[in-house]
Amino acid sequence: TLARQLANTSETAVEKLKSRLREARAVHCFALGAQDTALASLLQHQLLPAGIAINLCQDASLMRMTASTLSDDHLLLVLVTAEADTVLQSATLQARTQGVTIIALTPPQHALANMAADIIPLPDSPQLARYALLLLVDLLNDTLMA
């Protein structure tokens, strides 16, 4: 399944994400749920040595407050491997109205994919999505450190 995920992961999308991570004045990540917050925390810790500091929001109220302060020079990563609740969708929509660049790390048919400027597609299965995100973190680390 990792070989399939690697084949389905667009090199262009990874390069675009890498570029946006480097150019953004601030990077924020919204994630809710046990698996998603753990994966977002991993992403946060793995990208720090590359000089990418990610503000992780895993609280619904904090997401709304954060979304209201974002601007067009920020980057918002929205990580969802399963269904996103309405609070996460609402905070993402609020960030979108603020002009923030949003990249969704989610299955392509997910509602949050429609709110994003770009999407890094994850498999529908939460377990496979977890492996896909681990692969993405490794790809980002390899390209950011190079």
Stretch-by-stretch model annotation:
Residues 23-145:
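Glycine-rich phosphate-binding loops that contact phosphosugars or nucleotide phosphates
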Residues 11-17, 62-66:
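Short, charged beta->alpha transition segments
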